């Protein structure tokens, strides 16, 4: 599987297919989202919210929870707010988690 991924990435870079995904590190909609890492949400969540690449900082973990007030999720949200201009935070769960 690793060889397939590396080959795809090589072709992706050589063809400059990445250019259509270019975005600022600052989220266009000043939005951060904490959600579950469930694979069913990979494309579904942004599509359901009308988000494009660069619109939001999306933080994912098992269950979409803040388990530790000093952990990596809180650190990511603090950086999003204080460094990257985020003004809105959504915590989005889902059924059948």
Language-model features and meaning:
Residues 1-66:
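Short, conserved "active-site rim" segments that organize catalytic pockets and cofactor/ligand binding
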């Amino acid at each position: 599987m690793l060889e397939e991924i590396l080959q795809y990435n090589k072709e992706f870079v050589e063809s400059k297919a990445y250019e259509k995904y270019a975005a600022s590190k600052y989220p266009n909609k000043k939005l951060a989202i904490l959600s579950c890492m469930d694979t069913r949400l990979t494309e579904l969540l942004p599509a359901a919210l009308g988000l494009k690449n660069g619109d939001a900082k999306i933080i994912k973990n098992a269950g979409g929870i803040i388990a530790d007030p000093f952990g990596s999720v809180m650190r990511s949200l603090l950086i999003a707010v204080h460094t990257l201009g985020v003004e809105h935070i959504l915590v989005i769960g889902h059924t059948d988690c």
